[in-house]
């Protein structure tokens, strides 16, 4: 059984009510529940964490190096465009990760079109709303099952 870690960045706790025309009506609790069911059905465990604080996410990524985490799914949200610290933590722990976005950042404002994570990620899933998480989990489960 592999352990997967799902990290949600700032403002994702507001999913379902924040700009639903951009991010949809699905809540973060709904997403986490669906991911837990998906991982469990494949015989794996998942832990989810949302934080609006960069240092909390950095601390959790650093802990992943020693706690048996096999794969990370991360939606850095606004930190996508600003967080060298989170990028450096992911690079330092060397746990493979997939970058996730509900919307497609490439179709949004210019400042949202640069990611500090994409070049380090195994892959990027974006633009499919809450399904972006499901597709990323599918890919992660295939990878951990192959090892």
Swiss-Prot record:
Which InterPro entries is this protein grouped with?
DHquinase_II (IPR001874), DHquinase_II_CS (IPR018509), DHquinase_II_sf (IPR036441)
Q: Name any one Pfam family assigned in the record.
A: DHquinase_II
Where on this chain does substrate bind? 75, 81, 88, 102-103, 112
| GO process terms (BP) | amino acid biosynthetic process; aromatic amino acid family biosynthetic process; chorismate biosynthetic process; quinate catabolic process
Asked if the keyword Amino-acid biosynthesis belongs to this entry, the reply reads: yes
Enzyme class, UniProt record, top EC level: lyase
Sorted UniProt keywords: Amino-acid biosynthesis, Aromatic amino acid biosynthesis, Lyase
Give EC number(s), comma-separated: 4.2.1.10
Q: Tell me, how does this one assemble?
A: Homododecamer.
Q: Which PANTHER family does the annotation name?
A: CATABOLIC 3-DEHYDROQUINASE
Family to which the UniProt record says this protein belongs: Belongs to the type-II 3-dehydroquinase family.
The protein's name is 3-dehydroquinate dehydratase
Q: Which organism is it from?
A: Stenotrophomonas maltophilia (strain K279a)
């Amino acid at each position: 059984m592999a352990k997967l870690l799902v990290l949600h960045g700032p403002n994702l706790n507001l999913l379902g009510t924040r700009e639903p025309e951009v991010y949809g009506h699905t809540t973060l609790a709904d997403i986490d529940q669906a991911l837990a069911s998906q991982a469990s059905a494949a015989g794996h465990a998942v832990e989810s964490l949302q934080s609006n604080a960069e240092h909390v996410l950095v601390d959790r990524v650093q802990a992943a190096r020693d706690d048996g985490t096999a794969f990370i799914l991360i939606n850095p949200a606004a930190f996508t465009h600003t967080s060298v610290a989170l990028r450096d933590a992911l690079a330092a722990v060397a746990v493979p990760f997939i970058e996730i976005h509900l919307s497609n950042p490439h179709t949004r404002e210019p400042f949202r079109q640069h990611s500090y994570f994409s070049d380090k990620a195994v892959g990027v899933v974006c633009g499919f709303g809450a399904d972006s998480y499901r597709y990323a989990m599918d890919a992660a489960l295939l990878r951990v099952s192959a090892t």
